Amino acid sequence: MKHIRNFSIIAHIDHGKSTLSDRLIQVCGGLSDREMAAQVLDSMDLERERGITIKAQSVTLDYHAKDGNTYQLNFIDTPGHVDFSYEVSRSLAACEGALLVVDAGQGVEAQTLANCYTALEMNLDVVPVLNKIDLPQAEPERVALEIEDIVGIEAINAVRCSAKTGIGVEDVLEEIVAKIPPPVGDETAPLQALIIDSWFDAYLGVVSLVRIKHGVLKKGEKFKVMSTGQNYNADRVGIFTPKEKDKLELRAGEVGYVISGIKEIHGAPVGDTLTHAKHGADKPLPGFKKVKPQVYAGVFPISTDEYENFRDALNKLSLNDASLFFEPETSSALGFGFRIGYLGLLHMEIVQERLEREYNLDLITTAPTVVYEVVMTNGDIVYVDNPSDLPALNNIDEIHEPIVEANILVPKEYLGNVITLCIEKRGSQTNMVYHGNQVAVTYHLPMAEVVMDFFDRLKSTSRGYASLEYNFIRFDPADMVRLDILINGDRVDALAMIIHRSNIRHRGLALVEKMKELIPRQMFDIAIQAAVGSQIIARSTIKALRKDVTAKCYGGDVSRKKKLLNKQKEGKKRMKQVGNVEVPQEAFLAVLKLND
C-alpha cells in the first residue's frame, strides 16, 4: 500500500488540468501514441466542444520513479467551473492529496481558491504546480508569491512545467510521489468501499467507480449496498488506464470500477458504501453532503408523447449527475413536464444539452427562478421555486430572497467596472483586500441577480479577467412581486416571474414589447398586458389582420359600406370571444434572453 498515491487535479477553468492529465497518461504509458487524443479524459462530446470538464474521470497509472520503485498513481481529473464544485468535493473525498494547477501567466483566480480551500478543509496535502511556463507572458516568480499571499501555502519551490510541451512533467510525478502521503487502510478489515461516481451503460447496467478504504473486493464476490441493504454479485472489477482493464481484485487504497448488472437506476447511489454480504462492516463511510439545487426551471417535452422517454432519460442522467433534482409539473400552456433543480445556469445548459443529445429529446425550458422563503400572514413559512405557486399577495406577510456571498478576484484596473455592476445588481460590499495587482472583493448579492446573467456581465466588464465564486449564506427580506403576462386577459403560467419591485416597470415593458414581436397576428386584436396582482403596468396590442370588405363597392351610397364594415366588426367581436391565441415556442425562450 505504501506505493499507492491517490490525488486529484484542481484548478480554475482553462489553467490546463486536462492537458496536464494527458501528459501524465503519456509519460506513464497509459495509452500508446496512436491512441492519444487531446483531452483524453473529456469523453463527452459536449466537454470537447465547450473545452470544459464536466464529469470527474479517474485513471490508474504505473510510474517508475527515480528511487527505483514502481508507484500506482490513481488520479481524478476534476471540473473547474463554479457550477460543478460538488463534483470536485466528491473527487477529493477519494484522495489523500491534490495538485493545485495555476496558470503562470494569469495567476490565482477565484475558483482556484474555492477548490483549494475545499481540499484543505478535507485535510488533503495540496501540491502547487505552475503550468504554462512556455508562454511569453508567464511570470512564475510573481505567481508563486501570489499563491503564498492569497492561498497561504508554500509555493516558492513549486514545480514549474508546461503541460503542452511536456517540460517538467516528470518533476510533477516525482513531486506527487514525494509530497502526497500513501493511503491509510487495513486490508484484513471488513470491506468498506465508497462509491465516488456511477453511470448507466445500456449493456452492462450500472457501472460504479469506487475507492476501497478497507478490505479487499474480489471478482465474483457477493457485496451489499449499505443504504438499501440489497445484495449483488461483483461480475467484473478493474481499473481505468484510461481503457477498462479487468482485474481479479481491488485492494484497500485503490480506485477502480465494479460492474454487477444492477438494472434499477438507483441501485447504487453515489456517496454510498459497499461491504461484503456476509461479515460486512458495521457502519457506512461518511458520504458527501447533499447539494441543494439553487436554480429551478420547468422543462417540457415539445411533443407530449415524449413524456415517458423524458422521465427515463432524467432517471438515467440523475444517476450520473448526483446533484440533479426533479419532480413532475403541469402547465396549462405547455402540458406535462418536470420542474428541475440545477446548481447554476451553466449546469442548466449542460443538462438540457445532454438530454437533447444523448436521449434525442426536444425540450423547452421556462425562465429559471431561485427558491424564495415566503412568510404567510398566519405565521407559516413556505418555500416557493415556481412563480405560479406564489400565494395571493393578501396572504403574504413578507418574502425573503436568497443572498449569496460572492468572492470576486479582479485586476486593479477593472475594479471600478465590477463595483458598478455589483451596485446595479443590488449588492452590498463586505470586504476588499489588495494582493499585489489583484483585488479580492466580497459582495453580498441577491442570488436571483447572480443567476440570470451576472457571470457573463462580469466577464465582459473586466475583459474576461475577473473570476467569481459564490455560495448561499442566508435569506433576507425583500420587496419581491410576481409579474404576470396576460394575453387577452388570460394568465400564461409559463411566462410568470418573481422580480424586485424596483424592476417591474422596466421588465414589464420589455417583455410586452418582446411578446408583441413574437406572437403572430390573428383576425382579431390581441391585448398583451403585464400585471402585478390586479394592477396593469404595461400593455401593448397586436392589431388584427382585416380583409378589405368594401373593395367590391364603388360609388353609390356610404350606408352600403357602413353596413359591410359593421358586419365585419360583429364577426371580429364574436371571433374574439371564442378565438384562442397560440403562444409560440420562441416567446418562452425570449423571457430567458431578456437582458436588462
Swiss-Prot record:
Name of this protein: Elongation factor 4
GO cellular component, one term: plasma membrane
UniProt GO molecular function: GTP binding; GTPase activity; guanosine tetraphosphate binding; ribosome binding; translation elongation factor activity
Enzyme class, first EC level, given as a word: hydrolase
GO biological process entries: positive regulation of translation
Keyword set, alphabetical order: Cell inner membrane, Cell membrane, GTP-binding, Hydrolase, Membrane, Nucleotide-binding, Protein biosynthesis
Function: Required for accurate and efficient protein synthesis under certain stress conditions. May act as a fidelity factor of the translation reaction, by catalyzing a one-codon backward translocation of tRNAs on improperly translocated ribosomes. Back-translocation proceeds from a post-translocation (POST) complex to a pre-translocation (PRE) complex, thus giving elongation factor G a second chance to translocate the tRNAs correctly. Binds to ribosomes in a GTP-dependent manner.
Organism expressing this protein natively: Shewanella denitrificans (strain OS217 / ATCC BAA-1090 / DSM 15013)
